[in-house]
Amino acid sequence: LPALSQADRVEQRQWMKDWLARRFGVSATGLWLTERVWEPGLPEDLVAAGVSYALVDDRHFLVTGFERHQLHRPWRTESGGAALSLLPIDERLRYLIPFRPPQELADYLRTLQAQELPMAVLADDGEKFGGWPGTAEWVWGRGWLDRFLETLETLAADGVMRLVTPSQALASVTPGGLAYLPT
């Protein structure tokens, strides 16, 4: 999106929103900005396109001076008078899932709970679950996915975590305040 003109950003977002409505019958209000993509002027264009929140790599926050423990809640940003909610994607989760045994994920989420950190966000590439070299055998052949799903069920039953949509997280977790992220 940052490589597109303002008008093209809005149009690109509208195309995707229309497709999601046709395909799934939903009106998407958020998006995932992949692979460390960010420009300070994006909020104005995204809000103009009907976006109220974006999932972004935590790296954008960390290079600005945020500490990791601060990234377990939503933040707000703005440009051109338009405000946008930001959900920092947890880098640790990206490296645990699916590359490490699910017990390590459980340990990490229990640590976050003990520290009373209210949120951990994951948005990641689907090809990690079988498309990358060696991942099909690990995820499917050696049972990682089954163990992962069992671990999630246990964590939910134990009250360690709840799986929620980004909109639900925004409604239930107090934002940290304003964050102005660099390019």
Residue positions per predicted region:
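Distinct, well-ordered alpha-helical segments
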Residues: 39-47
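Metal-dependent polysaccharide deacetylase catalytic core of the NodB/CE4 family, i.e.
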Residues: 1-35, 82-96, 117
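Acidic, His- and aromatic-enriched active-site or binding-groove loops in soluble protein domains
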Residues: 10-22, 26, 47-82, 149
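Conserved beta-strand positions
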Residues: 33, 55-56, 124
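Flexible loop residues that form catalytic
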Residues: 36, 59, 127
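Short, solvent-exposed turn/loop segments enriched in Gly/Ser/Thr/Pro and often Arg
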Residues: 30-39, 167-170
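Active-site and substrate-binding clefts of carbohydrate-active enzymes
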Residues: 70-84, 88-92, 96, 103-183
